[in-house]
């Protein structure tokens, strides 16, 4: 009986119901009306920002922990 309750109360809703936030992430860029050039620019911007963060992390010169 506990197995059936677990299946119907936990596993069944997790498998069938989809959250609203997950729906747009599953679509391709073309379906979101984003052309490949715009997608490439966004990706390039994020990669550049990430690289700069690791090369030059934010460390103020006059902070109390340095």
From Swiss-Prot:
Annotated localization: Secreted
Role summary: Ac1 weakly inhibits N-methyl-D-aspartate receptor subunit 2B (NR2B) (IC(50)=8.22 uM). In vivo, shortens sleep latency and extends sleep time after lateral brain administration. Is more potent than Ac1-O6P for these effects. Also has an analgesic activity similar to that of Ac1-O6P. Ac1-O6P has no or very weak activity on voltage-gated channels and receptors tested. In vivo, shortens sleep latency and extends sleep time after lateral brain administration. Is less potent than Ac1 for these effects. Also has an analgesic activity similar to that of Ac1.
Chief location of this protein within or outside the cell: secreted
Tissue note: Expressed by the venom duct.
GO molecular function, one term: toxin activity
GO cellular component terms, semicolon-separated: extracellular region; host cell postsynaptic membrane
Signal sequence residues: 1-17
Organism: Conus achatinus
UniProt entry keywords in alphabetical sequence: Cleavage on pair of basic residues, D-amino acid, Hydroxylation, Ion channel impairing toxin, Ionotropic glutamate receptor inhibitor, Neurotoxin, Postsynaptic neurotoxin, Secreted, Signal, Toxin
Residues annotated with Hydroxyproline modification: 57, 60
Residue list for modification D-tryptophan: 64
Protein name as catalogued: Conopeptide-Ac1
Protein family according to the UniProt entry: Belongs to the conotoxin A superfamily.
Miscellaneous notes: The mature peptide does not contain cysteine residue. Negative results: the wild-type toxin has no or very weak activity on voltage-gated sodium channel, voltage-gated potassium channel, voltage-gated calcium channels, and NR2A/GRIN2A N-methyl-D-aspartate (NMDA) receptors.
Modifications after synthesis and translation: Ac1-O6P is hydroxylated once at Pro-60, whereas Ac1 is hydroxylated at both Pro-57 and Pro-60. Trp-64 is supposed to be a D-amino acid in Ac1-O6P. Hydroxylation at Pro-57 is important for activity on N-methyl-D-aspartate receptors, since Ac1 is 5-fold more potent than Ac1 on NR2A/GRIN2A and NR2B/GRIN2B N-methyl-D-aspartate (NMDA) receptors.
Prodomain residues: 18-51
Membrane-crossing residue ranges in chain numbering: none
